[in-house]
Amino acid sequence: MDSSNVEENLNPETKSAEEQNPLAIFHSSLPIASLSLTLFPSSTQFLKLFAHHPNKVKIPTQASSLTHLSLSSVSPFPSSRISFKSTIAANPLQSPLSIVPRRPVDPSSAAALRRAAVVWFRNDLRVHDNECLNSANDECVSVLPVYCFDPRDYGKSSSGFDKTGPFRAQFLIESVSELRKNLQARGSNLVVRVGKPEAVLVELAKEIGADAVYAHREVSHDEVKAEGKIETAMKEEGVEVKYFWGSTLYHLDDLPFKIEDLPSNYGAFKDKVQKLEIRKTIAALDQLKSLPSRGDVELGDIPSLLDLGISPTPRTSQEGKPTMVGGETEALTRLKSFAADCQARLSKGNQKGGNNSVFGANFSCKISPWLAMGSISPRSMFDELKKTISASTTSTTPRNGPGDTGLNWLMYELLWRDFFRFITKKYSSAKTQVEAGPATACTGAFA
């Protein structure tokens, strides 16, 4: 090749359209640019260039290379000669660029909805007034509701006592069974496992390709500790954990102070929160998102007392009927029964003093277990009683008479319950040990 030919090749005005286009197929003896699969012209002279280099003609075996443009020159000339090299990308056969999603996408995904999710039920065994469940259904294509029977909650404590007695355990089993039925009635279901949540949830998230776990926060030391373990485990898998608050009458985010500044005295707490607005209850969804199609997750059986290592105990009353039946349906039935009782008292115009204790004893004994399990929410209780009493109150009802007796007692009980849950949250969430003064106690507060 003489110098005139070189200058002609370097001058863009003397080049053909194919020569000026770096993506075009060359029909000259110059080096060829390849688009993943090497393309050959019909020129026999050009084919001779590869006669001594058969190992350079390869068919790519990686599908990803077909989607990435690579231009590289193969020249028989010495390095001192002119060569044409791509400035677009390296040869994918030498450094393949693979674009793999961080997590497999659910096959039923739609563009408007972003992911599959796990809803971790804890002490919120209900479908009504459940922000966690509703949010997951609003934001996700598919939802996997899960409940874990944590083996650490059963057996003997270090003091030799049962961590969970047979009556409470049976009540919990019934509550979980009722939750499963309520989810099934809405097109969903409940996956049940016996195991540590931080292990079970990660495994399930992998199986269904979940990008998020939805759960309500709790307040005790062990529960907060479990939340930390789950966040750590999920972070390693690239799964987001979204927590909600739904166990108190007043919402944690609505408090006029930070949780670490919570007063240790009930009176000071009451003065600061009693004028706050109580958030409205959240209606139960009539239809829930279906379970993820990916993973083919087994639902699992609800364990018996023996499965949990607990000896069954006769739990019938003198009439031969179960003393208490767990579940959301029973909780709502008892709430309506108590509201009807309050309404009956109002209609009779019972204005005798000192009746608050009667309301409290009746209500506290009949609703506390369901409230503790989360089969019913404090806000639902407040709304139902307020609605009933408002409908029964007339212009002739004295201001401080029975028209607000039941509601006043309910507020009194729920405020105490809020105080104890927030004070527990304050110290269980503290990163460093805090010297705590004694909190005022009240025997009438709910569990």
Swiss-Prot record:
Boundaries of every Photolyase/cryptochrome alpha/beta domain copy: 115-249
Keywords: Chromophore, FAD, Flavoprotein, Photoreceptor protein, Receptor, Sensory transduction
Biased composition (Polar residues): 1-14
Xref: SUPFAM superfamilies: Cryptochrome/photolyase FAD-binding domain, Cryptochrome/photolyase, N-terminal domain
Cofactor note: Binds 1 FAD per subunit.
Cofactor(s) for this UniProt protein: FAD
Superkingdom per UniProt: Eukaryota
Region (Disordered): 1-20
Family named by the database record: Belongs to the DNA photolyase class-1 family.
Name the record gives this protein: Blue-light photoreceptor PHR2
Source species of the chain: Arabidopsis thaliana
Species classification: Eukaryota, Viridiplantae, Streptophyta, Embryophyta, Tracheophyta
Gene name for this UniProt entry: PHR2
